[in-house]
Amino acid sequence: MNNPLPDVALTEVSSALVSLDWVGMQGVEVPVRLAEAGVRYPVHAHVDLQVDLADPSVKGIHMSRLYRLLDRYAEHQILSPDTLGALLEAMVESHLDCHSSRARLTLSFNLLCRRPALITEGLSGWKSYPVKLDATWHAGRLCLDVSADITYSSTCPCSAALSRQLLEGAFTARFGRQSFVDPMQVATWLRENASFATPHSQRSVATVQVRVAEQATELGLMTLIDAVEQALGTPVQTAVKRADEQAFARLNGQNLMYVEDAARKVQQALEGRYAASSVSVRHFESLHPHDAAAQTSNYLS
């Protein structure tokens, strides 16, 4: 028997004549290849992909067409603005019989790359950065936003000042009545008592989103991540030895920051590099059972 299989999406009309903004699939898993410095392996990505269904008389789209386009893309292409634009355009063209004119795609993955230790030569470890791409295609134009989560350490300026005051008091109590203090005696005292009080610090996360220029040929994921880490000054480390941990302690002391400071530092580092950028930071407070948060954006509302 070679009876044709029914396709009700083509042969039936929707009972409710309502146009739909987006129709498609969510959470499709594919391997994706990247052209990023220090990234040598494909990433495991989750993809949402959709087209519009503006014609209310069309019952449904053809999801298998979208899946096959994505599957071929993952098999043969390297992720870039150009290849993403071509994929989205092909998604629209595959649904001309549904009168679709727009397509969008969201792609999420963890970007793994090696990061060197601060001091120890030859020592490095893997660090993961959650990344998301939001791309839309309409009227022959690609709109692409890239976001990434960057983890760093934040030390509270107020807590640092309070700790210094306590240390000052302890030092004065010990040496205040002496007209002369032997430097070696002070050094010994500091070695034993400098942690008389310590400021609170915590792991923190900056989520940044930027608009990729239309003429861009690369995603520039590592360029974005490096810029944020450099602005903050205290990115979390991977493999460390004592010398690296000491260097990290110095960086934390040199980069005291409130959540407001962190948001401003990152936004300032991004301005001028991208057409639009937004920053959202969270400090997972060790002093409080709640988080501190700040946001800023120059995206047009």
UniProtKB/Swiss-Prot annotation:
GO biological process: tetrahydrofolate biosynthetic process
Keyword Hydrolase found: yes
Keywords: Hydrolase
Catalyzed chemical reaction(s): GTP + H2O = 7,8-dihydroneopterin 3'-triphosphate + formate + H(+)
Annotated positions for site May be catalytically important: C156
Highest taxon in the source lineage: Bacteria
Pathway(s) this gene product operates in, as recorded in its UniProt entry: Cofactor biosynthesis; 7,8-dihydroneopterin triphosphate biosynthesis; 7,8-dihydroneopterin triphosphate from GTP: step 1/1
EC class name: hydrolase
Gene Ontology molecular-function annotations: GTP cyclohydrolase I activity
Record-linked Pfam families: GCHY-1
EC number in record: 3.5.4.16
Keyword Transit peptide included in the entry's annotation: no
Family assignment from sequence similarity: Belongs to the GTP cyclohydrolase IV family.
Function: Converts GTP to 7,8-dihydroneopterin triphosphate.
PANTHER family (alphabetical): GTP CYCLOHYDROLASE MPTA (PTHR36445:SF1)
Protein's recorded name: GTP cyclohydrolase FolE2
Organism: Pseudomonas savastanoi pv. phaseolicola (strain 1448A / Race 6) (Pseudomonas syringae pv. phaseolicola (strain 1448A / Race 6))
